[in-house]
Amino acid sequence: IAPTILELAGVEPDGMLPISGRSIVNILRSEKNGIVDETRKYVFMGRERHSSSRWENLGYPQRAIRSREHLFIWNIKPERWPAGAPQAINNETGKVYPMYGIDEKGIHHSGWAFTDVDDAPSKSFLIENYKDPVIHPYFCMAYDKRPEFELYNVNDDPFCLHNLAGNANYVSVEKELKTALQNEMERSGDPRMIGPDKEIFETYIRYSPIRIFPKPDWEK
């Protein structure tokens, strides 16, 4: 995004910190359909902390690579909840909220659980009805933990519902994308790959309010 904005604004990045990304202005301005820039084989993505949604203000680190046919995701800390912890603690009273933020009347309170997802009627509906056999699969897709590696054929499975990671028929594809992702992480100096402090992103200060959560089992 940064190099694209700079090019559109006619600003040279002189004196700025190094930018690893490449501008996509040529793609945005193109009138072609399909693949516009044949020199681009992959798109790389990453995530760390989105909000205060886990114990000790931890994030949910992910790295991903997208080719024309496949999406490969590395969930670096699969023991964590991607949508935020399923229980929070009241900052004032120290009381632990009920599991999934559902009170004794069966009503979901959005600020009590899965706080990496904003308040919404759809959020509350899925959580309040998670025991319903029809609703449960959707609840899991939205809020459950994810495996360390995910691989999807985005042409055959555009909604990415069928994880092919570990599938014997996709060993070569998974290896290719995993290697390309790791090579890019090394090239760009990603701390999650090359260190020396692979957890440095966890130490960044958050200046907005911080929620409190129970200590997870994997830290006890």
Predicted regions and their residues:
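Surface-exposed charge patches
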Residues: 4, 63, 183
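Long, internal low-complexity/basic segments
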Residues: 117, 127-149, 154-220
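C-terminal cap/loop subdomain of S1 sulfatases and analogous C-terminal strand-loop tails that border
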Residues: 13-150
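Sec/Tat-exported extracytoplasmic proteins
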Residues: 9, 28, 32, 181, ...
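Active-site-proximal alpha-helical segments within enzyme catalytic domains
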Residues: 1-8
